[in-house]
Amino acid sequence: MTFLLLLVSVCMMATGEERTKRDVCELPFEEGPCFAAIRVYAYNAETGDCEQLTYGGCEGNGNRFATLEDCDNACARY
């Protein structure tokens, strides 16, 4: 019984983490209110591609990746 409970808990955590990754990819890109002009990549859910954009350096959301590879790895469609 304890093993079953542990197994279910692990599965729920893994599913929740995967859902969170997809949720981040569905967010619109937010450049934030600052003016740092940092080149980043964000996933565009409408086109299904990662795009290079300019991030202001503060606030924004999780749809922001340092490299194209990071963006592709996080947001590749299944």
From Swiss-Prot:
Coiled coil: none annotated. GO terms for molecular function: serine-type endopeptidase inhibitor activity; toxin activity. Keywords: Disulfide bond, Protease inhibitor, Secreted, Serine protease inhibitor, Signal, Toxin. The keyword Membrane does not apply. Residues 25-75 form the BPTI/Kunitz inhibitor domain. Belongs to the venom Kunitz-type family. Residues 17-20 form a propeptide. One of its GO terms (cellular component) is extracellular region. It comes from Californiconus californicus (California cone). The lineage of its organism: Eukaryota, Metazoa, Spiralia, Lophotrochozoa, Mollusca. InterPro entries: Kunitz_BPTI, Kunitz_BPTI_sf, TFPI/VKTCI-like. The cysteine framework is IX (C-C-C-C-C-C). Disulfide bonds join 25-75, 34-58, 50-71. The record marks 35-36 as: Reactive bond for chymotrypsin. Gene3D superfamilies: Pancreatic trypsin inhibitor Kunitz domain. Expressed by the venom duct. This is Kunitz-type serine protease inhibitor conotoxin Cal9.1a. PANTHER family: BPTI_KUNITZ INHIBITOR DOMAIN-CONTAINING PROTEIN, KUNITZ-TYPE PROTEASE INHIBITOR-RELATED. It is found in: Secreted. Residues 1-16 form the signal peptide.
